[in-house]
Amino acid sequence: MKHSKKLLLCISFLLITVFISGCGSMTKEDNKEEKIKKGFEKTLGMYPIKNLEDLYDKEGYRDEEFDEGDKGTWILYSEMVIQRKGDDLVTRGMILKVNRNTRTSKGNYIINKISTDSKGVSRNTQKKFPVKMENNKIIPIKKIEDSKIKREIDEFKFFAQYANFNSLKDYKNGDIATNPKVPSYSAEYDLENSDYNVKQLRKRYDIPTQQAPKLLLKGTGDLKGSSIGSKDIEFTFIEKPKKNIYFSDSLDYKPSEGH
């Protein structure tokens, strides 16, 4: 009888130990997830930026990489990648550098096409169309003959202009990955088509699938802030061999070039 009681006590102790260890691991993962979300909130909390010219008066995270007197440059980048099954992979996106020193904004509308021939050899074709921003409107710097591309530039909006991440704190049970040696970090979430930002993307792009996407928050550098690191977000609808649909976006604050 005494042996049975001792055995029960040992088993109970082991179960409690395992439970506490499990809770400890969950707490660590929860802390990592919260830190990643807080790191992204500093930028995503600015969305939507309906008037991009507001960035001229908005300062980001500064570190020793900035020269004295440099007000910094905001760099926006948004792109949609669509590859229907068996077709070429086509990327359409824009980069815009908002220089707070000169209060000017220039960039490029970029169309990238990756095709693969019958021998499996890939070929990359890229077209760049210089653009600038005036009165919160993106306009071509050079004359564009192609009416389709001209219309795409005229109608283009950066994700930062219409996205809203007020519900970021409600995203739970993300797939968390960290590498302190790089350092790098990421959090991935399964979204529903009812998600506000997913609906906004479907409204603006012809997305040839009803499959709901995954949201990936990924970055490098110090989570608290770093002009060397980066923070990117991706909405992946489909990721398969010869069939890909995903959207990428970033908003970074960097030292100005040539300052």
UniProtKB/Swiss-Prot annotation:
Record GO cellular component, one term: plasma membrane
Membrane topology designation: Lipid-anchor
Residues where lipid is bound covalently (N-palmitoyl cysteine): 23
Signal peptide positions on this chain: 1-22
Localisation per UniProt entry: Cell membrane
Highest taxon in the source lineage: Bacteria
Disulfide pairings: none
Entries under Gene3D superfamilies matching the protein: 2.50.20.40
Lipid-modified sites (S-diacylglycerol cysteine): 23
Entry keywords, A to Z: Cell membrane, Lipoprotein, Membrane, Palmitate, Signal
Family the UniProt entry places it in: Belongs to the staphylococcal tandem lipoprotein family.
NCBIfam families listed in its UniProt record: SA_tandem_lipo
Entry protein name: Uncharacterized lipoprotein SERP2453
